[in-house]
């Protein structure tokens, strides 16, 4: 059986692991290190350096040394995040013919998957050297909040590197897998995986359950930010140093590519030192020069100063934690373990923020740099058939439902529901004798149907003639383990059914998902007003329907003036319902109710008369029976007399 390796393709560093016979090992690279810097250098003559060798020569070859390519993967050049990075990157980011963000090095235009493939190729070679055999299959991890194009671009990078990517799995899930399989106990636990890496942030709430010796990893909720990570922390420090140097020397180091590369190295080193010390010194002699001669940079940075520079970045990571917990239906007290993943999670202030939010100390027995690769390797062994004691369950990221009366979306499956899943709900017709219904399938979080993503629609016909609200149409949503959605509708009266199969992930990018959720929050007030308007409209239509029916049955018993008054109120109410003025609809509904009061009294009186007539018949029948009844005495027997 071919070995399936696990690769954590990180923004700053990457890691490789293999799992055999239930034992997982992190494999060292050619330099003997357990992690590899995700840095690629393009030299004159076509030579390519990857990892530490590329990082070492970066200062003298800044324009052709690429780092953090993962931040560009699957992105368009015009994306605001890319535009923000252009200012701070020493290498050139360009717009490709298809609108994607690419990089120019040594005169060549390179795509991010092409650049990332160099790191993957180095991982592949290290695995082959360790195993002594050819490696062609891998599980590669991505941030949980990566969109479809980013995931596809990661798969493309694997293919360019000569790897068949068997599965793309989420980094927090992989870390939970590594943590859960490492625990010898059979305890069920809920874990929060806080993954603050070099370029991305994810939070996942995962339940680890023991099922007869097997372990099930169920993602309850996930959230994140694909442009928040250690690179942003470095940049805050770089910007501070540049501003201070400009104040002192009047020189802007932003214009000097070689100085920027030296600053990046110094900032990264200072950041790491400040995780263990209270102060560090940055010394960069001959950082630049002007007419007066060479300039040297010497600056002390305290931990407190650095923490103040990145305070808002740390705060930005806490809000998704709050959302993920809310989506999972849990409170912080329900979380058994907090796992920190990603190099940036080593920062004491980050750990303090996580501890304060979750109310417990994060675990220290998980290696933040290696856990993700280890989890990927475990999943690789599962896929190769080497082990069957692990089950991963994913979630659907957005709510699913159908359009119902009034143009609102009625949700059948809520976002963050574990898949596979199935849900059914009974609906009815909106008109008398309606012979068909259209089932319009939607995905999103908004109340207004038109504001959500339309996934498709189908018709259910041959509904037996009946008054509105009488037929029972059962709509069933069924999502399989592949995320494919099947929708069916069945008339419970006739047994007639219709269905449609929808590929839930097709045509819906993560940008759309995030936009929908954010739109839902921003437009909560508008949605509330729409819901209230629809409720008023439905109430008005129900009264209109009832009055029309009563008028048809008892109208001839009303005098002409009374009937005319009701018909006028009816017409006004029907006109109001066509508009979007809730107050007008409510007013006309009230007026119709008042105008039709006499008609209502007649309907009530008729119903009462019919009921009394029925009771009278029953009483007569009962009296006839009583003629044959003989009275008898009886004595109640107490328990103690028995």
Swiss-Prot record:
Record's note on what induces expression: By stress conditions e.g. heat shock.
One example GO MF annotation: ATP binding
Keyword Chaperone: yes
Region listing for Disordered, in residue ranges: 608-642
Swiss-Prot/TrEMBL keywords: ATP-binding, Chaperone, Nucleotide-binding, Phosphoprotein, Stress response
CDD domains: ASKHA_NBD_HSP70_DnaK-like
Stretches with biased composition (Low complexity): 608-622
InterPro entries in UniProt: ATPase_NBD, Chaperone_DnaK, Heat_shock_70_CS, HSP70_C_sf, HSP70_peptide-bd_sf, Hsp_70_fam
Phosphothreonine modifications at: 200
Top-rank taxon: Bacteria
A Pfam family this chain is assigned to: HSP70
Designated name of the protein: Chaperone protein DnaK
Species assigned in the record: Neisseria meningitidis serogroup C / serotype 2a (strain ATCC 700532 / DSM 15464 / FAM18)
Annotated gene: dnaK
